[in-house]
């Protein structure tokens, strides 16, 4: 099971993500980002590639795809906040774009 990020680990793990467009979600210990694609099909293809990793790591995003824009929220429900798995999946999502 994952552990909630400590204050000491937040900066090193989340700082690079914030520099790449991720942001904290108001009122939650979660991060969010919207990915834009040329069309719905490209967005779905990206979501399928991400889904393979999410399933492999047993860590699933909250997300929606509307007209080629995929809104993503990452948090770890088991720890009621952010964990290293959220940072790992966020990095993977960025790399698959």
UniProtKB/Swiss-Prot annotation:
Its EC number is 4.2.1.96. It comes from the Bacteria. One of its GO terms (biological process) is tetrahydrobiopterin biosynthetic process. The keyword Lyase applies. It holds the Pfam family Pterin_4a. It catalyses: (4aS,6R)-4a-hydroxy-L-erythro-5,6,7,8-tetrahydrobiopterin = (6R)-L-erythro-6,7-dihydrobiopterin + H2O. Keywords: Lyase. Signal peptide: none annotated. GO terms for molecular function: 4-alpha-hydroxytetrahydrobiopterin dehydratase activity. Belongs to the pterin-4-alpha-carbinolamine dehydratase family. NCBIfam families: PRK00823.1-3. This is Putative pterin-4-alpha-carbinolamine dehydratase. It comes from Ruegeria pomeroyi (strain ATCC 700808 / DSM 15171 / DSS-3) (Silicibacter pomeroyi).
């Amino acid at each position: 099971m994952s552990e909630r990020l400590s204050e000491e680990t937040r900066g090193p793990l989340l700082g690079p993500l914030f520099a790449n467009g991720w942001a904290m979600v108001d009122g939650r210990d979660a991060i969010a980002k919207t990915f834009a694609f040329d069309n719905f099909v490209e967005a779905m293809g990206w979501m399928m590639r991400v889904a393979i990793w999410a399933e492999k790591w047993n860590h699933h995003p909250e997300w929606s795809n509307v007209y080629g824009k995929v809104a993503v929220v990452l948090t770890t429900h088991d720890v009621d906040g952010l964990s290293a798995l959220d940072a790992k999946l966020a990095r993977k999502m960025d790399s698959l774009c």
